[in-house]
Amino acid sequence: HGHTDPQWYADNAPFPNASALFITPDHYVFRMLYSQGIALEDLGIPRRDGAPVERDARKIWRTFAAHYHLFRGTPTRLWLDHAFATVFGCTERLTAESADRNFDRINACLALPEFRPRALFERFNIEVIATTESPLDALDHHRRLRASGWKGRVITAYRPDPVVDPEFEGFRDHVLQLGALTREDTATWQGYLAAHRDRRAYFKAMGATSTDHGHPTARTC
């Protein structure tokens, strides 16, 4: 299980910059900063209402660097320090003062072919990595990966939260979409279960070997 986007491997395009790689897509990073009073907008996190957010990757990185001490003693800090030092060769501890130098070094690396997603996958000797997708996902990126001829094994995992958690935003519409997608009547219990069986079979056919769940507690009623 890895928090990666299958589009990374399907496109195999260079990562745009250090902020787009380490901050904006990583909820372990931006949630920590948000919990300490940093606005998500200042980290480039899109708003639901479409209002403007910070787009300057260097400014986002500077905000991150100025508050990097907040990660002290966390697993996230260990992961980041390891990546900065061993993958990108950063020799300076990340601080407000060293922010630009580290940003520029990482960006210079990301421009090289050996730092593209598939190259990093191979460099790390990853045998298999599972992404996680909604039952409503067509898995187009996984289809493209299969057709590409690349030997790296990137599989999906079935994450049904949008259609099993009534508190999930858009739950009702998602259940209706599930029915339309599978041609099952999800207004009935049997039809709802049949729709899940249909999508699970599709995910399995696309390589899935597991499910993934985001329940905040073990309570079911």
Can you describe what each PLM-predicted range is?
Residues 2-221:
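Metal-cofactor-binding active-site regions of metalloenzymes
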